[in-house]
Curated annotation (Swiss-Prot):
Its cofactor is [4Fe-4S] cluster. GO terms for molecular function: 4 iron, 4 sulfur cluster binding; 5-amino-6-(D-ribitylamino)uracil--L-tyrosine 4-hydroxyphenyl transferase activity; 7,8-didemethyl-8-hydroxy-5-deazariboflavin synthase activity; iron ion binding. Pathway: Cofactor biosynthesis; coenzyme F0 biosynthesis. Keywords: 4Fe-4S, Iron, Iron-sulfur, Metal-binding, S-adenosyl-L-methionine, Transferase. Its EC number is 2.5.1.147. Coiled coil: none annotated. The gene is cofH. Binds 1 [4Fe-4S] cluster. The cluster is coordinated with 3 cysteines and an exchangeable S-adenosyl-L-methionine. It is an enzyme of class 2 (transferase). This is 5-amino-6-(D-ribitylamino)uracil--L-tyrosine 4-hydroxyphenyl transferase. Catalyzes the radical-mediated synthesis of 5-amino-5-(4-hydroxybenzyl)-6-(D-ribitylimino)-5,6-dihydrouracil from 5-amino-6-(D-ribitylamino)uracil and L-tyrosine. Consists of two subunits, CofG and CofH.
Length: 356
């Protein structure tokens, strides 16, 4: 049974690390029930989704992340015309957002990112640009001889609306030193998103879990996100991302050592703990039908999640690492999946404003 004082702190938005560790020892469905009650109080029974398009413009990358299956030595780099074609398809499908990210090209300068933004805004100024991770921003800044602040200001001036809060992985340096030693440090990621928020660029917050991380690491990550949000208010959502262990070095090592990927119960516990730790700070917790599958994503709606993500149209990163739930889904199917949980589907925009 969950102690009353832990429940009280959960409803107040002051759950501690110790509380979270205690909750993990509770019978899982009691934990899920508490998270679901907090979700209902925070956001009600609406479940949101977005009609969007994912565009991964290159899989060429100088990075050395051990969890990546997307990077390819042969590689591709979409031309601006190819990107424009994909944006046109997004427009025709009714997308309100394009999410554009790519690998770290050697010596890429900010000009490419500006050209990509202009490719969207020149023809479809109404489409929201949700583009470029904190890692990409830092990479472009360094190659261009600019500060991160100058880079963010330039991107915003050329049409950047919001940023994905990817490249966070686990915000614990001892974990990052194993899984992505050449990536941003914990503090560099924090500094980049904090600066973006203060410049008026909202971001999402993500967490990729289930590799070499512990529950303590995951809790510390979520509490770090909470601290940033208390300072800036710039996160629109929190998105847990379950590690996909196929076709990458970390996954191969896990299999050799007989360590299994996340169980479904672990995935659902993540949503519950995130909802409880982030209560009163971040309202929107997104589940991933791509990574979890449609049925487990439905279950996440009973464990604290309130958003089903996007239609995507294409998805390369998770599918290359073993995700088998598809790369695209229609708005109609998303609504059907949501209604099956006795919740009300609501189409939203990137900033969680209702469209219909």
């Amino acid at each position: 049974m969950i102690p009353d004082e832990i429940k009280e702190r959960a409803y107040q938005g002051t759950t501690t690390k110790e509380d979270a560790l205690t909750l993990l020892e509770i019978e899982p469905f009691e934990l899920f029930e508490l998270a679901d009650q907090i979700r209902a109080k925070a956001v009600g029974d609406n479940v949101t989704y977005i009609v969007n398009r994912n565009i991964n413009f290159t899989d060429i990358c100088i990075g050395t992340c051990g969890f990546c299956a997307f990077k390819d030595k042969k590689g591709y780099l979409l031309s601006i015309d190819q990107i424009k074609d994909k944006i046109k398809e997004a427009h025709v499908s009714g997308a309100t957002e394009v999410c554009i990210q790519g690998g770290l090209l050697p010596n890429v300068k900010i000009d490419l990112y500006i050209d990509i933004l202009k490719a969207v805004k020149s023809d479809y100024p109404h489409i929201h640009t949700h583009c470029f991770s904190p890692m990409e921003v830092n990479h472009a800044a360094k190659a261009s001889g600019l500060s991160v602040e100058e880079t963010l200001k330039t991107l915003k001036a050329n049409g950047l609306n919001t940023m994905p809060g990817t490249a966070a992985e686990i915000l614990v340096d001892k974990v990052r030193n194993i899984i992505c030693p050449d990536k941003l440090t914990r503090q560099e990621w924090i500094d980049t998103v904090t600066l973006a928020h203060k410049l008026g660029i909202q971001t999402t917050a993500t967490m990729m879990y289930g590799h070499v991380d512990t529950w303590e690491d995951r809790i510390e990550h979520i509490l770090t996100i909470r601290r940033i949000q208390k300072d800036t208010g710039g996160f629109s959502e929190f998105v847990p991302l379950s590690f996909m262990p196929y076709n990458n070095p970390i996954g191969e090592k896990m299999m050799e050592e007989g360590r299994f990927m996340n169980t479904g119960i672990d995935d659902l516990k993540i949503y519950a703990i995130a909802r409880i730790l982030l209560n009163t700070h971040i309202n929107n917790i997104q589940t991933s039908w791509v990574k979890l599958g449609k049925k487990l994503a439905q279950m996440a709606l009973y464990c604290g999640a309130n958003d089903m993500g996007g239609t995507l149209m294409e998805e390369s990163i998770s599918s290359s690492a073993g995700a088998s739930s598809g790369e695209a889904i229609s708005a109609e199917e998303l609504e059907w999946i949501i209604r099956a949980t006795d919740r009300k589907p609501v189409q939203r925009d990137t900033l969680y404003r209702s469209i219909r």
